[in-house]
């Protein structure tokens, strides 16, 4: 009995010491895995983000197989305290038409209005949402956080169900989403909607900190998560049909539900390190269950002359065969319709929910194991690099790889980019560009005064006129622009 009392006293003393000198940037422990790294795979073209200013210029944009356009580079960011607003005027004026593309849409007239303005940029009401890139209040983990518009890397909870979801990957169909979070010492809520006009994906998490006002135990939280695709495709077979705007016509849809419970405890929190182990139990209805056990680390290194930080996430997974971790991921808008699965010596594409149900095959045991690792390095904000890797035993296409880098603070040159490869068979398959690869990069080189040479590369998805499969298209933009801070 005395030994138990002594051991308890020592543990409490250690925990109390670990909680001293909390980091100044937030009064709340980080409730989720991606809280600090959501922007790791964000818009690389936002090279001058973080303050108020405008970029004005003209460039030439080449869209793979389609043609070349004179493109406006008109973006402005306004920041006032916690409020941020980003606007744009994105116009593509055809310069050269590739008359070999596409089946059902070869001519300049079929691709443009008046032979000039790209038609698929402005043939749906939601296209006008491109004028407002984002409207933001606060930052992730603030007491109140609101983000409306483009979602580049939005997660819910520890990111085990909804991880870095993006609504920006379609070339022709932009969406204005909404993320809204409320965080207090005792309770909090995270929400996510992919498109405020006609939402498909809706997700949320509510968490409770029973001892939110106690110095030692305040780091313990329990949460409940849920996500739903209201119109998930299923029984998708054969070629895809499309409407006049290029949206796939899916005859069979149904709601798909996913839910989970989680708990975490912040073991360490001081000026140098934050350490949070967590456990999630998730279920995808009709497909399978999964258990995630992980740890989040945020380490601040006292390096002379520069503030250096290291963030890591390591996770071990136990899964039923039909369970797909991070089901609503960065490529979900593509995968819900066209998801890669192995077939013989090749690859077939089915709806993601069909793939999950087929993989279950009546097996309810947690027979499959997997792991996830993520590392991010920040050298005083001047250089930011990182990567992630995950794999799954028993799944020949269960691996994923991601890398990113950003050099945002140098005046002469600014660089940003990322690469993500999903559903690959291993490292030998890691750098193949196809419908499972996501690549984006941007550069700004200072020529003179406020004048910069700009170059942007984007890999997006399109269901081209007359085609029956969604495919990746690459667009490259290069031109001159002026950045005016205000």
Where are the regions a protein language model picked out?
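Extended, charged low-complexity segments
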Residues: 414, 440, 444-486
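Short, solvent-exposed loop/edge-beta patches enriched in aromatic
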Residues: 76-85, 139-143, 410, 447-449
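Surface-exposed loop and membrane-interface regions of Gram-negative outer-membrane beta-barrel proteins
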Residues: 85-134, 161
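Sec-dependent signal peptide recognition
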Residues: 2-9
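Hydrophobic h-region of N-terminal signal peptides that target proteins for export
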Residues: 10-18
């Amino acid at each position: 009995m005395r030994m138990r009392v002594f051991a308890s006293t020592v543990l409490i003393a250690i925990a109390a010491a670990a909680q001293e000198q909390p980091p100044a940037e937030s009064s709340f422990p980080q409730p989720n895995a991606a809280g600090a790294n959501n922007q790791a795979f964000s818009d690389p073209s936002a090279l001058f983000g973080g303050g108020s200013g405008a970029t004005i210029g003209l460039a030439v944009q080449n869209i793979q197989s389609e043609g070349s356009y004179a493109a406006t580079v008109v973006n402005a960011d306004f920041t006032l305290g916690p409020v941020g607003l980003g606007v744009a005027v994105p116009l593509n004026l055809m310069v050269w038409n590739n008359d070999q593309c596409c089946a059902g849409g070869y001519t300049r007239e079929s691709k443009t209005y008046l032979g000039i303005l790209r038609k698929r940029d402005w043939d749906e009401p939601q296209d006008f949402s491109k004028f407002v890139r984002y409207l933001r209040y606060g930052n992730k983990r603030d007491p109140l956080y609101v983000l409306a518009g483009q979602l580049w890397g939005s997660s819910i909870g520890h990111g085990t169900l909804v991880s870095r979801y993006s609504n920006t990957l379609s070339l022709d169909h932009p969406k204005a989403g909404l993320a809204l979070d409320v965080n207090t010492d005792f309770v909090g809520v995270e929400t996510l909607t992919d498109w405020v006009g006609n939402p498909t994906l809706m997700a949320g998490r509510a968490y409770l900190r029973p001892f939110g006002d106690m110095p030692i135990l305040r780091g313990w939280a329990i949460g409940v998560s849920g996500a739903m695709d209201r119109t998930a495709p299923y029984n998708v077979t054969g070629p895809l049909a499309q409407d006049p705007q290029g949206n796939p016509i899916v005859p069979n849809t149904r709601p798909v539900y996913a839910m989970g419970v989680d708990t975490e405890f912040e073991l360490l929190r001081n000026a140098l390190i934050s350490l949070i182990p967590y456990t999630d139990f998730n279920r995808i209805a009709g497909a399978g269950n999964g258990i995630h056990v992980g740890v989040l680390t945020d380490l601040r290194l006292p390096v002379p002359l520069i503030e250096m930080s290291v963030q890591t996430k390591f996770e071990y997974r136990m899964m039923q065969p039909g369970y797909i971790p991070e089901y609503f991921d960065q490529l979900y808008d593509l995968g819900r319709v066209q998801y890669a699965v192995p077939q013989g010596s090749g690859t077939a594409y089915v709806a993601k929910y069909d793939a999950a149900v087929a993989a279950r095959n009546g097996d309810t045991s947690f027979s499959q194991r997997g792991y996830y690792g993520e590392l991010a390095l920040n050298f005083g904000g001047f250089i930011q690099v990182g990567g992630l890797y995950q794999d799954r035993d028993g799944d020949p296409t269960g691996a994923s790889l991601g890398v990113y880098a950003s050099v945002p603070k140098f005046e002469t040159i600014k660089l940003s980019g990322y690469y993500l490869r999903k559903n690959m068979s291993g490292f030998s398959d890691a750098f193949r560009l196809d419908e499972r690869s996501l690549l984006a990069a941007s550069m700004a080189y200072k020529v003179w005064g406020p004048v910069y040479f700009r170059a942007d590369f984007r890999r997006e998805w399109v269901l081209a006129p007359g085609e029956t499969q969604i495919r990746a298209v690459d667009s490259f933009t290069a031109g001159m622009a002026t950045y005016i801070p205000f």
